[in-house]
Amino acid sequence: MGKKVIVAMLLMISFVSIQAQTNNKEQKQAEKIEDPDNLATEYFSQIMGVALSATSNLKLYQFVYDWIGTPYRLGGGTKRGVDCSGFATELYNKVFSTLIGNNSRNIFSMVNPINKEELKEGDLVFFKIGSRSITHMGVYMGNNKFAHASSSKGVMISDLDEAYWRRYYYKGGRLLASLRD
């Protein structure tokens, strides 16, 4: 009878130990998933089709992730509603600590125009949609993707290779050195 009790106790201790290890692993996995930085990284890795490298500007990606789905509002610059230049202005203020204008045409005057092939994370992209002047802008994220406030879907990520954006793309721009920092 003593051996049965000892075996039963050993089995119970083993079961409790295994259960505790399983719970600890599940808790660590849940913490990893709920970490906003991990969520942003996972989101952009999927959207952009590439793993974000350690050299990526994670502050940029986190900002965009936090604003995805913000509704469009002409002249807006808050999470209650934002237009394309208001979004870029907020992003540059919060991510790069740089103040830029709040109108896409005025902002274009603050950049050095660059070719599409030269675009880097954080550069600006400009569009002429149904006009001879700039009517829309966004922030380049890498891998031909850009973040912008769409009048129909709010803040979102789009691809410069999509037919619509390819048709209306005007130029890329990098903020003038005198305006940075």
Regions found by a protein language model. Name each.
Residues 57-61, 65, 85-89, 119, ...:
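Extracytoplasmic/secreted envelope proteins and their assembly/folding machinery
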